[in-house]
Structures are given as C-alpha cells and as structure tokens.
Amino acid sequence: MARIAGVNIPTNKRVVIALTYIYGIGISLANKICESCNIDHNIRVVNLSDDEIIRIRNFIRENYVVEGDLRKEVSMNIKFLTDIGCYRGLRHRRGLPVRGQRTHTNAKTRKGRSRLPVAAKKK
C-alpha cells in the first residue's frame, strides 16, 4: 500500500479515486494533482513507481492542507466563531443549521432526535 499524507491509499484502485481517500482531496483536486505531477489518471496505484508516489506526496505536502491539519483548521474556525459570539457561532453551539436553512419542518439531522418523554400506556 502506498502511504500519502499519513493515509494508506488502496492499491487496486485508479490513482484519482485512491487520492480521494485522503481527507481534503476530492475528485477535481485529485485530477489537478495528477495533471501537475504528469501522471495518467487511469493508471492503478499498484503500477505507480516509487518516484511517482514521492512526486505526489511532495506536491500535496507543499500545496495543500489535508488530513489532521485541515481538521484542526476547520475546528479552530468553528471555535473562533463560537468564542466571538456571532450568529453563526451561536448556531454551531446550539447544533442548528448555520447557513439560513429553515428549521420548522426540516433540519432533523442537524437538530438530532427530539427529547420528548414517551407517553404512558393506558390501562
């Protein structure tokens, strides 16, 4: 298995698909990485040479924030919003939708299960 950005990427998949296993890299970014490193999109990870893997690894390290650093950056941004007490921070703190979606009928996933007491069974 090739190890890129601290992630073991699957060897039997195409390079573009395998790169998406890294947090912070999607399909379009994986395509850009392959183009920049002059690697064919359809080649499998098994068929990559060590030189090509090192080129991909170095390109990602130099140009993108991925995995743990990206997770930390996102959580710090959310923490900053909650600390300054802005509206978006309050919505994060309360576990409600942040970007203006309606909550009267929707947002069940974001709000979580309702904490209503179960009615007692009649005898």
From Swiss-Prot:
Signal peptide feature range: none
GO MF term set: rRNA binding; structural constituent of ribosome; tRNA binding
Record GO cellular component, one term: cytosol
Chain residue ranges for the region called Disordered: 97-123
UniProt cross-references to InterPro entries, sorted A to Z: Rbsml_uS13_C, Ribosomal_uS13, Ribosomal_uS13-like_H2TH, Ribosomal_uS13_bac-type, Ribosomal_uS13_CS
Residue stretches spanning the membrane: none
PROSITE patterns named among the record's database cross-references: RIBOSOMAL_S13_1, RIBOSOMAL_S13_2
SUPFAM superfamilies to which the protein is assigned, alphabetical: S13-like H2TH domain
Swiss-Prot/TrEMBL keywords: Ribonucleoprotein, Ribosomal protein, RNA-binding, rRNA-binding, tRNA-binding
GO biological process: translation
Domain of life: Bacteria
Family the UniProt entry places it in: Belongs to the universal ribosomal protein uS13 family.
Alphabetized NCBIfam families for the sequence: uS13_bact
UniProt function note: Located at the top of the head of the 30S subunit, it contacts several helices of the 16S rRNA. In the 70S ribosome it contacts the 23S rRNA (bridge B1a) and protein L5 of the 50S subunit (bridge B1b), connecting the 2 subunits; these bridges are implicated in subunit movement. Contacts the tRNAs in the A and P-sites.
Quaternary state and interactors: Part of the 30S ribosomal subunit. Forms a loose heterodimer with protein S19. Forms two bridges to the 50S subunit in the 70S ribosome.
Name by which UniProt lists this protein: Small ribosomal subunit protein uS13
Source organism per UniProt: Ehrlichia ruminantium (strain Gardel)
